[in-house]
Amino acid sequence: DPKPSPYPAPIKKEEKPKQPNILILFTDDQGYADLGCFGSKENQTPVLDKLAKEGTKFTSFYAQPVCGPSRSALLTGRYPFRSKGWSMPASEITFAEILKEVGYQTACVGKWDVSNRKAIIDRMPNAQGFDYYFGALGANDSGKSVLHSNNDLVGTTDDMAGLTRLYTNKAIDYLVNQRDSQKPFLLYLAHTMMHTIIDASAEFKEKTGNNLYRAVVEEFDYETGRLLNTLDRLGLGDNTLVIYTTDNGPW
């Protein structure tokens, strides 16, 4: 047998941990008890219930009462009286800007609502750390959403029934066709629903007996399932941190 070496074995260099992908799902005006995992006996939300069961479920929150302040707080980690809510200045640093500095590619799909609902270029998503943006800069109070792709106005839609699916399709398209597979990603998907004026597809209205709010909640759950299935199909599920929350509860 060979003699044991008098020298200690070389220390293996530790591999750098793989950076996780990050998916943030953010709904609008959704109530605490709207999901099965938070007590709803009426709304069927199997996808989000499974997410809660497999992950960490938080049950006590402090939230802002309205959209803009909640969103600026989420984006910056700062109290709304500092980050200014709907009037969030270009000088605020978002989590997207921080993540870009450490190699992330960044995308925002859906409702922005921190640029006073106006196309102010230096306060829109592309200027606040997001490489890609598709969505509405404000709310759908009038039953319409004005849509931008990056900084470009692409049109106005009054199809509130199709908005959740549209945003999900854009998020899926980003994952499948646009992201760089060699980099970790941040995808911030901020749905307009369940903010009034609400609507859902004919399929979910029929499924819920024309209970419109239930239809909106259940369609969101279904569309979330499509998105999570896409992560799994692409082999990304095990290395993606999924965070789901709502902005402020029912309005």
Regions found by a protein language model. Give the residues of each.
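Formylglycine-dependent sulfatase
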Residues: 1-251
